[in-house]
């Protein structure tokens, strides 16, 4: 995908997600979500959507610092607070998105989410 196509798709994805819409429409059928630090992998559009919703339910005071795009890839940098441990240090993270044929095909989340991930039960991993 060209950079402008990638940028538009990522903007549309976050727009729908921010409006609490059906953001899984942007996923390939066999999309994957991997929590690198915890070794958790979730596969499939519905399962990934459910996992992302559950993960966001454990996050508060979310700050997006930067979104960078290139041909067929995007990277989001941010930080948040674990709602279960509000006195803990902020969690810095980076999510890398792979895109092809106007769909998100894979997402990899880098950060120290170990404690938060243990509170989430993926629907299909």
Report the location of each language-model feature:
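Short N-terminal signal/transit or membrane-insertion segments
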Residues: 7-11, 31-39, 92
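A beta-strand edge to alpha-helix "cap/lid" segment located at domain peripheries
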Residues: 2, 49-125
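Short acidic-aromatic low-complexity motifs
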Residues: 1-26
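A generic signature of intrinsically disordered, low-complexity regions enriched in glycine/proline
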Residues: 15-17, 41, 83, 102
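A solvent-exposed, acidic/Ser-Thr-rich amphipathic alpha-helical stretch
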Residues: 20-72
């Amino acid at each position: 995908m060209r950079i402008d196509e990638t940028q538009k798709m990522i903007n549309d994805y976050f727009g729908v997600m921010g409006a609490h819409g059906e953001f899984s429409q942007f996923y390939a059928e066999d999309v994957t979500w991997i929590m690198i630090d915890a070794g958790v992998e979730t596969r499939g559009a519905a399962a990934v959507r459910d996992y992302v919703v559950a993960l966001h339910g454990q996050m508060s005071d979310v700050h997006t610092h930067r979104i960078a795009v290139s041909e067929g890839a995007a990277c989001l940098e941010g930080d948040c607070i674990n709602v279960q441990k509000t006195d803990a240090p902020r969690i810095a993270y980076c999510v890398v998105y792979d895109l092809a044929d106007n769909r998100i095909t894979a997402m990899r989340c880098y950060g120290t989410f170990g404690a938060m991930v243990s509170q989430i039960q993926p629907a299909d991993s």
